[in-house]
Amino acid sequence: MAAPDLSTNLQEEATCAICLDYFTDPVMTDCGHNFCRECIRRCWGQPEGPYACPECRELFPQRNLRPNRPLAKMAEMARRLHPPSPVPQGVCAAHREPLAAFCGDELRLLCAACERSGEHWAHRVRPLQDAAEDLKSKLEKSLEHLRKQMEDALLFQAQAEETCSLWQKMVETQRQNVLTEFERLRRLLVEEEQLLLQRLEEEELEVLPPLRESAARLGQQSAQLAELITELEGRCQLPALGLLQDIRDTLRRVQDVKLQPPEVVPMEMRTVCRVPGLVEALRRFRGDMTLDPDTANPELVLSEDRRSVRRGDLRQALPDSPERFDPGPCVLGREPLTSGRHYWEVEVGERASWALGVCRENANRKEKGELFAGNGFWILVFLGSYYNSSERAFAPLRDPPRRVGIFLDYEAGHLSFYSANDGSLLYTFPETPFSGTLRALFSPLSSSPTPMTICRLKGGPGDGLAPQ
């Protein structure tokens, strides 16, 4: 009988007096009794002492719990030797007594032993049936609310599905619109390209044959003149008899020489490169551009909003610095251009001259002489009847632009100038591998009461504002 008694003693020693189950994380109080850590924590729920031992009722001024690891091993051994039997439904797992009450604070079912333990002494504990009736009433109200929410959810789901379907149709319609519109634009561009090439060919056939004919005729006249000059030079070397002999024919031929000068051909081309809708498309890359007063030449006068500049009659007393242009009559845009695509427009009006473009941040701003001859400057210069660039490419102008659009594609090394009035291409620089920081450059060149003004763009056709 010793073995069963030993087994029983092991079970009793490994059982918590509060939950009546094997110890879980046992701790020892100052009086030497052991409890599960969670059990004693719930039993001593009050924030301040004194705290009473659940077994001997000894009082302690403060919580002082020491882990009991040997007891934890003993409880684990007892659990393996005598695993707890399955708890029947309606019976407390801790005390093996019928569940007869319900704790409203912890939402737990309680037996009589749970109530006697003192763990729930300050809680709202009610008989099982009363608690069940109250909970059933609450659940029925919750069900009513949930059913209403479910109705709303189904309605919202139907609306969302309908919206999704409508959006899908809208996207598909818009996709077809995009495809149709761009196909139309492609056809329009092809037709416009063919029309421009045809006009160029017609202009070439109209202008070049007379020019070639005139050049050939002048070549024949030059050859006849050269032959006559050679004859006269030879006759001048002859003695008197040879010089005067048959002179009548020679003099007649000299008198018959009549040089026909070539016809004056206008150098302005009637056909210009103009792509429909290009300027409107470029305005997608618009950005706010303002002038940097710290870079302005002392002769330049800037507006208060830093969007307009003109060349004044007097030189202002401004502090000199490496950032300031002098003697070049220039000013830079404040915004650095380091990547991406950028487009801005400048109202130049009927100015006699101007210069626009970009330059490197570190370009020499104290250069004397030809400012725009390369050296980190990419500038288009207008000089009354024609324009040139730092690449030394000259091109006459039939109708000087009143507003100039500048488009920079940094990564592509592309810089182009357009007439924003009609979209015609003014000039494109050869592809350039840009590096470092670029800044927009503005120069009125000549004095005029009319300023150059950076336009405010909204992106649509004709949305650029006129000068303020």
Swiss-Prot record:
Q: Which residues form a coiled coil?
A: 128-233
Query: Which sequence ranges are marked TM in the entry?
Result: none
Provide this UniProt record's keywords sorted from A to Z: Antiviral defense, Coiled coil, Cytoplasm, Isopeptide bond, Metal-binding, Nucleus, Phosphoprotein, Transferase, Ubl conjugation, Ubl conjugation pathway, Zinc, Zinc-finger
Spell out the Gene3D superfamilies in the cross-references.
Answer: 2.60.120.920, Classic Zinc Finger, Zinc/RING finger domain, C3HC4 (zinc finger)
The chemistry this enzyme catalyses reads: S-ubiquitinyl-[E2 ubiquitin-conjugating enzyme]-L-cysteine + [acceptor protein]-L-lysine = [E2 ubiquitin-conjugating enzyme]-L-cysteine + N(6)-ubiquitinyl-[acceptor protein]-L-lysine
Choose any GO biological process term that the UniProt entry carries and state it: negative regulation of AIM2 inflammasome complex assembly
Q: Which SMART domains match?
A: BBOX, PRY, RING, SPRY
Cite the B30.2/SPRY domain residue spans from the record. Answer: 268-461
Free-text function comment from the UniProt entry: E3 ubiquitin-protein ligase that promotes the degradation of insoluble ubiquitinated proteins, including insoluble PAX6, poly-Gln repeat expanded HTT and poly-Ala repeat expanded ARX. Mediates PAX6 ubiquitination leading to proteasomal degradation, thereby modulating cortical neurogenesis. May also inhibit PAX6 transcriptional activity, possibly in part by preventing the binding of PAX6 to its consensus sequences. May contribute to the regulation of the intracellular level of HN (humanin) or HN-containing proteins through the proteasomal degradation pathway.
Zinc finger regions (RING-type), where? 16-57
Its pathway is: Protein modification; protein ubiquitination
Residues that hold Zn(2+) according to the record: 92, 95, 114, 120
How does it get modified after it is made?
Autoubiquitinated upon DNA stimulation; autoubiquitination promotes interaction with SQSTM1/p62 and recruitment of AIM2 to autophagosomes.
**Domain remark text:** The coiled-coil domain and the B30.2 domain are both necessary for interaction with HN and PAX6. They are also involved in MED15-binding.
Which family would the database say this protein is a member of? Belongs to the TRIM/RBCC family.
Q: Which domain of life is it from?
A: Eukaryota
Q: Name one Pfam family in it.
A: SPRY
Per its record, how is this protein called by name?
E3 ubiquitin-protein ligase TRIM11
Which residues, renumbered to this chain, carry the PTM Phosphoserine? Answer: 85
Q: Name one GO cellular component term.
A: cytoplasm
